[in-house]
Swiss-Prot record:
Binds DNA as a dimer. NCBIfam families: PRK13503.1. The record marks D241, D250 as: Interaction with sigma-70. The keyword Transcription applies. It holds the Pfam family AraC_binding. SMART domains: HTH_ARAC. This is HTH-type transcriptional activator RhaS. One of its GO terms (cellular component) is cytoplasm. InterPro entries: AraC-bd (IPR003313), AraC_XylS_family_regulators (IPR050204), Homeodomain-like_sf (IPR009057), HTH-like (IPR037923), HTH_AraC (IPR018060), RhaR_RhaS-like_N (IPR047220), RmlC-like_jellyroll (IPR014710), Tscrpt_reg_AraC-type_HTH (IPR020449). PANTHER family: HTH-TYPE TRANSCRIPTIONAL ACTIVATOR RHAS, HTH-TYPE TRANSCRIPTIONAL ACTIVATOR RHAS-RELATED. It is found in: Cytoplasm.
Length: 278
């Protein structure tokens, strides 16, 4: 597995924060690093396989990656993101207690993926741009300024994450997308789902299309197919069982949609013919 080292990304040995844009981020094999990072998805779509679990990421996704986590990107489509790198929560010169603002693992579950709405994403970009402008300066005031900006970034993300901000339709759409990640195999009635998240059906269609480039049903089908592809690669379940587990009632229809999406059949993926990045 590829290991990325801080010496190749941080501007100096005493720098606590570094900014690494990926505009765009291409498919990238599984790797880990000797530093931590916050991945901020600007726009586009892709699959982020995090510690073996696939997540669909779009504009507004924020992922917190620790130094022992392994992850990869695949099936990217104009995926543009910015990585905010930091050595460790306890390696800041002027800040202490940052760990309390970061996601916490509880009972083996780590809430690695958050979502923010478009207006918050704009504020995030501004903070990141300020940090990036100061990267070449190593004096104490500049170091303190970068660390303060990093603290502001964490506070903004925490206050604006799904769990704490459901006051507008964009935030409710983000909550809906997170719900689909857990309920993709369920039979989805879009009228009922729109009501569940206090959205009109028209608003749901419009905002989801704006954020992902896909209609709701097309997004759900892609999500199901992504989950199925992951199971084909990483489980011994039959194609039929995987189809049913991922929300398809007809394995032949599943195979047709799968081939249309990936240009490979489920059997091809199972046999590794697509040259999956290891």
């Amino acid at each position: 597995m590829t290991v990325l080292h801080s010496v190749d990304f941080f501007p100096s040995g005493n720098a606590s924060v570094a900014i690494e844009p990926r505009l765009p981020q291409a498919d990238f094999p599984e790797h880990h690093h000797d530093f931590h990072e916050i991945v901020i998805v600007e726009h586009g779509t892709g699959i982020h396989v995090f510690n073996g679990q696939p997540y669909t990421i779009t504009g507004g996704t924020v992922c917190f990656v620790r130094d022992h986590d392994r992850h990869l990107y695949e099936h990217t489509d104009n995926l543009c993101l910015t990585n905010v790198l930091y050595r460790s929560p306890d390696r800041f010169q002027f800040l202490a207690g940052l760990n309390q603002l970061l996601p916490q693992e509880l009972d083996g579950q780590y809430p690695s993926h958050w979502r923010v709405n478009h207006s918050v994403l704009q504020q995030v970009r501004q903070l990141v741009a300020q940090m990036e402008q100061q990267e070449g300066e190593n004096d104490l005031p500049s170091t303190a300024s970068r660390e303060i900006l990093f603290m502001q970034l964490l506070l903004l993300l925490r206050k604006s994450s799904l769990q704490e901000n459901l006051e507008n339709s964009a935030s409710r759409l983000n909550l809906l997308l997170a719900w689909l990640e857990d309920h993709f195999a369920d039979e989805v009635n879009w009228d009922a789902v729109a009501d569940q998240f206090s959205l009109s059906l028209r608003t749901l269609h419009r905002q989801l299309k704006q954020q992902t480039g896909l209609t709701p049903q097309r997004y759900l089908n892609r999500l199901r197919l992504m989950k199925a592809r992951h199971l084909l690669r990483h489980s011994e379940a039959s194609v039929t069982d995987i189809a049913y587990r991922c929300g398809f009632s007809d394995s032949n229809h599943f195979s047709t949609l799968f081939h249309r999406e990936f240009n490979w059949s489920p059997r091809d993926i199972r046999q590794g013919r697509d040259g999956f990045l290891q």
